[in-house]
Structure formats: C-alpha cells, structure tokens
Amino acid sequence: RYTIPNREKDMTEADGAAPRPEGATQTAAKRARRRAAKPKAEAAPQPPPATATQPPKPPAAEPPRPLNELIMEQTAESLSALSANLTQAMTRANQVFSTAFIDQTKDAATWQPDPLGMQVALNDVWSHLATQPETLRDAHAKLWERYADIWQRHTAYMLTGQQPDEGPVRDKRFRDPEWRSNPAFSMLRESYLATSEFITDLVEKAEGVDDATKRKAAFFIKQAVDAASPSNFLMTNPAALRALFQTGGESLLKGVENLAKDLKRGEGMLAISQTDLDAYKVGVNVATTPGKVVFRNRVFELIQYAPTTETVHEVPLLIFPPWINKFYILDLQPKNSMIKWLTDQGHTVFLVSWVNPDEDMAEVTFEDYAREGIYAAVDAVEKAAGVSRMNTVGYCVGGTLLAATLAHMAKKGDERIQSATFFASQSDFKYAGDLLVFSDETGIKFLEDKMDQAGGVLDAQVMADTFNALRSNDLIWNYVVDNYYIGKQPPPFDLLYWNADQTRMPKELHLFYLRKFYRDNALTEGKLTMMGETLSLKDVTIPIFMQSSKEDHIAPAQSVYRSAQAFGGPVEYLMAGSGHIA
C-alpha cells in the first residue's frame, strides 16, 4: 500500500520498463508509529487459552493409478467394449463437427483469413531474426544442449528406475503424477517446454521490431505454443488416457456430448462451459442482497440496497461496475458479497446496473454514458438520499468512465462526489497488457466489422473469447481436457457463472473506448474532449484510492499504478494478490 505523492509527474518517460512504486510512503508503517506513540493501558489478565480439539484430518486422496497397470489389466472383453465406445465416439464427433461446420458457413461471406494482422507481425519478426545469425546460432545451440540433457537424464531414468528430483510442480497442465513418474511422458513434457521456451525467446530477441509488432507476434506465438502442449491431446495426456481405460471409453462419449452442447450454444462456434450454468439464478442464489430499483433510463437502472443497521452513514456510496458482464460481480452470494458487507457496515449503497444494449443503441457514445450514466446516477442518488455529496466506486471500465467524468466535473465545479475508489481500473493505458494486441487499427477494424454484422453491437461471445484467449491455458485448454477428453461436467462456481453471464456493447461506445483509451491514451495525455471540455485528471483533487492486483492480466498492476500518478489530489495505491476478479 502506497501513498502517491501529490506533485506533478512527468507522464511521458522514455519507453522501457513500466514504472514501479519507488520511494513511496508506506502508510501502514505511519499508522503503526502513530499507535506506538500513544500511551496504552495495562492489559487485563487473560485466562489461559483453551486447548482446541483438532478436527480429524480428512483422508488423503488416493493417487491416480499408473497407466501401465491399467493397460496390463485390460481383458479381451474390456478392450472390445473400449473399441466399440471409441467407434461410437468418433461417429458422433463427425456428426457434431459436420453440424458445426454448416452453422459456421452461414457467415462464410464475412470470414477474414488474418483479421488481426498476425501474419504481418510474424513475418516482420522472422525477417529481422534472419539478419541476426548469432542470435539464431546461440538459441539453437542452447536448445540442442537442453535436448541432450533431457535425453541423457531420461535414458538414465529408464535404465536405473531412479526418478530425478525436479522440485514442486508449478505448471498446472502437468500436475498429473504420470508426467514425472513415467519416463515417456516426462521426456515429452520436458522436450515440449524446452521447445516452447526456444520459440518464445526468439521473438523477444528480435532486434529492430517496434514494440507493438513484437507484442502482437509474441501473443500469437504464445497462443500457438500453448495449443501445441502435449497435455491438450488425448493420446498424450495421461489423465485423459487413464479415464479412457477406467471407463472403457465412456469418458470420451460423455466428452463428445459436452462438446456438442457447447457448439450448439455457440451456434457452430465453441462456447466452452466453464461452470454449471443451471446451478444459479439471479435473485435466487446469486445477487440476493435485498434492494430495489429507484431510477431508470435508457442506459442504466439504479439499485438502492436495503439498510441492515439501525443507523447509517450520512454520505451514501455509489458504485459503477463495468458494463462488460452484469452488475452483480460485487454481490455473488452472502458469504462473498461486498454489497452485503457494506450495508452491514452502515453504508447506504447504490449500484448502477448498465443496460444490455440491442441494435437500437448502436449509436450511443461514451459521452452519453457519462451524461446519462454517471451524471444521471449522481442526480438520482442526491434525490433518493437527500444529500448533496457522496462517495463513489468505479470497477474496471466503469472506473475509466468515472475518472473521465470526474475530470469533467472538476472543469464545471461540480463537487458532489467527495471521494473515488477504483478497483482494477485504468485511466492510463500505456502499459495495458495483451489487450493492446486487439487495439491497433487492424484489430479495431476487425471488431467494427463484427459489430456491423451484429447490427451495431459487439456480441457478448466475442468479448468472452478475447478474455479467454488472454489466459488460454486456464480458460480454454483446461476445459478442453476436463470437459471433452475426460467427460467431466464443470462444477458450480458463482464467479464463473457471472463471467458467463455476458452483455453486448454499443458500437460507438466501444470504438471510442478502444481508439481514445487503448490506442491513443488520450485521457492522461490531456487530449480527451468530452461534452465540450478538454479533460485533465490533474484537475481531479478529491481523495482517490486505487486498487490493483498482482496477477491482473486485464488491468495490469503497473498500468494501474501509472494511472494513480495522473490525478491531482491525494492518492493511495494498493496492490493486492490474485487477478482481475479473483
């Protein structure tokens, strides 16, 4: 946790490493010193602590059986059943893929071979690498040295049976013990990791390639490398093979049916199920904190939550969540609902629920969302609560809109918002991470075409696919293995249910957001004009709290920290653990 010094900060430092919190004041240490300076009363005597009865530990799960044992136990009867189920699975898979192909060809006229400019970026990288023979020589020498080491160690392993000590498993793709205990799988795993590191390192070592091109090439190389992992193929995944032999092929039959459901739900495109979508219902077992809609216009509904304390704080709290997905990210279930926690602390909580737009809202703009969203919500809270000041929270893109509107309010002398808290929200987009790959003019034109095809809105699945690609191992390939190869049903998970409850976005709003923020970084550079005013975050002098997360891949911590430096008043910055939403 850091306090950002209230001083002018040069926001145009030379390209290089992103800024980190340097020389910042640790406010926790200050509070500790203040507490230490106060006289303390003598502690009252305490009874000795009771001896807690430790609950019995649950029995450890049995390790999965080695594949060799399962294969050796197969009988003629079991192999016959396995063969029959495999034949049935292949027949059904052919039907599923044929149906999906027919569904996809309905939009064949709009297909583009390389809509995001992947090949152009890769060609640029390879052409520059071709002029670096020493780099290529050293990289290949290192690769063959690793191959030789892998071969030598695994030959010794097969001859002696002594498994090499490799430390803890850090890559979740290879958590099955067979990836280490079986020399063949172990060698395959290590060879893949060596090769993937060789390829990705080459991209990084290409000289003379601009940052945007290198970022795009690195992103798509990583997608290809992740897809090529041996864990993603039935015949080279020990967990999938184990399930195949243990169930006589029924696991694959179930997996094909799971695949069929997801392709049907995606109308020919793969819409991967990440949770049990039938396990939750809004207002029944998610988003259950009592409240009512107190205002509505074409852009949003305003929910006021019922108080749970006898008295409440005078100043209400107004929350602006992202318009990507639904409003209840902060109100999943009572045990993890921030909304419930806030009302239990005596806060009067208002929350904006953005509209899920249709084609009629294609021309609605970012400025409309500021005027009819932020300003209208502030007016409505002022009327409902009977007060002329309030605290605010902006989450993700909701925070970006809030920051821009605060700058406009400062220009107009509107002082009704007395503080702002930002969760995983960027105002500066120079270091905005892999989403910058989709935010050059090539990517924006591709999305614009997609929105035109959809009648002027960005289809929810397009945004979901983009976010999944940012973490493909966790959000794509993990489910390919579990759902389609092993035949598991994804378990209920409230957060992933919310993640799957997607919304559309108006065309003009989204294009403005991509061009002005991701591409041009106009807000922090003082070049964003809204409602007739050129905005500057230095005009925003109210207290600001900025929360980032260490593993956030959508609003990277370094980007949020840079955003914190853009405001003109006191700012406290906190980097938490975990990722964008968990």
Task: Pin down the residues of each PLM region.
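Short amphipathic alpha-helix adjacent to the substrate-entry channel of hydrolases
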Residues: 331-349
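Short beta-strand element of the alpha/beta-hydrolase
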Residues: 313-323
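Alpha/beta-hydrolase-fold enzymes
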Residues: 209-242, 383, 387, 405-510
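Amphipathic, low-complexity, repeat-rich surface-exposed segments
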Residues: 1-301, 312-313, 350, 563
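Conserved alpha/beta-hydrolase "acid-adjacent" motif
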Residues: 553-559
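Alpha/beta-hydrolase
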Residues: 119, 239-294, 450-536, 542
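Short beta-strand/loop motif that positions the catalytic acidic residue
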Residues: 546-548, 552
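Alpha/beta-hydrolase active-site loop
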Residues: 361-385
